[in-house]
Amino acid sequence: EAGEECDCGTPANPCCDAATCKLRPGAQCAEGLCCDQCRFGDWNDDTCTGQSADCPRNGLYG
């Protein structure tokens, strides 16, 4: 929804502040195939580039 950076969820979420629906300090993401422990994963260029929590659209994955 407008103004939200992440899905509020529960207070136990280490990435997203449930009271504000904003990412916690130091977090880059709260969910997604390329989100690992609140950080963008950079496993390889075809799946996770380190720039987003989502896989890139490159013809192979989307």
UniProtKB/Swiss-Prot annotation:
It comes from the Eukaryota. It is found in: Secreted. Keywords: Cell adhesion impairing toxin, Disulfide bond, Hemostasis impairing toxin, Platelet aggregation inhibiting toxin, Secreted, Toxin. InterPro entries: Disintegrin_dom, Disintegrin_dom_sf. Expressed by the venom gland. Residues 1-62 form the Disintegrin domain. Inhibits ADP- (IC(50)=63 nM) and collagen-induced (IC(50)=53 nM) aggregation of human platelets. In vitro, inhibits adhesion of endothelial cells to vitronectin, type-I collagen and, to a lower degree, fibronectin and laminin. Monomer. Belongs to the venom metalloproteinase (M12B) family. P-II subfamily. P-IIa sub-subfamily. This is Disintegrin atropoimin.
